[in-house]
């Protein structure tokens, strides 16, 4: 499983009080998306951050809305989406655009975006990673942990 070797971060040890985090989540593949969102919210609530959730139509829209949230004052964004490979090149186009766009948004804003975009060969891979009952991984929680941890690290580096 891809989660082998993942860092062991205790979300209850994260003190994100004072941080503002926006979760931007796509609506495609609702069962998986809902699991990702629940995992992210659980971590953000435990860390004590102020959380805003914005739902977007799909993964292609994640970068522009993530950047807008960062420009509007969010300290970090958690980007959640699900793209499942089909029989056309559409999968590659959307996956590449969303991934590159999120990277650019983060770098240009100088703020972290937790990457919770699942690019999958089939629905079962998403269920296995969505933090649902019986799932092997919780990528929504992992993305939220990464966003909060990195936001705190950047605040420390910048002396804020």
Curated annotation (Swiss-Prot):
Active site, per annotation: 90
Statement: the UniProt record of this protein carries the keyword Disulfide bond: no
Lipoprotein among keywords: no
GO MF annotation list: 6,7-dimethyl-8-ribityllumazine synthase activity
Domain of life: Bacteria
Record GO biological process: riboflavin biosynthetic process
Entry's transmembrane regions: none
Residues reported to bind 5-amino-6-(D-ribitylamino)uracil: 28, 59-61, 82-84, 115
CDD domains: Lumazine_synthase-I
This protein's UniProt keywords: Riboflavin biosynthesis, Transferase
Catalytic activity as recorded in UniProt: (2S)-2-hydroxy-3-oxobutyl phosphate + 5-amino-6-(D-ribitylamino)uracil = 6,7-dimethyl-8-(1-D-ribityl)lumazine + phosphate + 2 H2O + H(+)
Disulfide partners: none
Gene3D superfamilies: Lumazine/riboflavin synthase (3.40.50.960)
Annotated metabolic or biological route of this protein: Cofactor biosynthesis; riboflavin biosynthesis; riboflavin from 2-hydroxy-3-oxobutyl phosphate and 5-amino-6-(D-ribitylamino)uracil: step 1/2
Pfam families the record matches: DMRL_synthase (PF00885)
Annotated EC: 2.5.1.78
Summary of the function given for this chain in its UniProt record: Catalyzes the formation of 6,7-dimethyl-8-ribityllumazine by condensation of 5-amino-6-(D-ribitylamino)uracil with 3,4-dihydroxy-2-butanone 4-phosphate. This is the penultimate step in the biosynthesis of riboflavin.
Membership in a protein family: Belongs to the DMRL synthase family.
Protein name per its UniProtKB record: 6,7-dimethyl-8-ribityllumazine synthase
Lineage: Bacteria, Bacillati, Actinomycetota, Actinomycetes, Micrococcales
């Amino acid at each position: 499983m891809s989660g082998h070797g993942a860092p062991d971060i205790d979300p209850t040890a994260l003190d994100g009080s004072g941080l503002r985090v926006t979760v931007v989540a796509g609506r495609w593949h609702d069962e998986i998306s809902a699991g990702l969102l629940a995992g992210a919210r659980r971590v953000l609530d435990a860390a004590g951050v102020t959380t805003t959730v914005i739902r977007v139509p799909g993964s292609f829209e994640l970068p522009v809305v993530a950047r807008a949230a960062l420009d509007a004052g969010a300290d970090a964004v958690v980007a959640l989406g699900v793209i499942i490979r089909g029989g056309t090149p559409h999968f590659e186009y959307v996956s590449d655009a969303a991934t590159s766009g999120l990277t650019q948004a983060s770098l240009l804003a100088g703020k972290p975006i937790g990457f919770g975009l699942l690019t999958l060969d089939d629905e079962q891979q998403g269920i296995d990673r969505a933090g649902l009952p019986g799932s092997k991984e919780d990528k929504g929680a992992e993305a939220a942990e990464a966003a909060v941890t990195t936001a705190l690290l950047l605040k420390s580096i910048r002396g804020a």
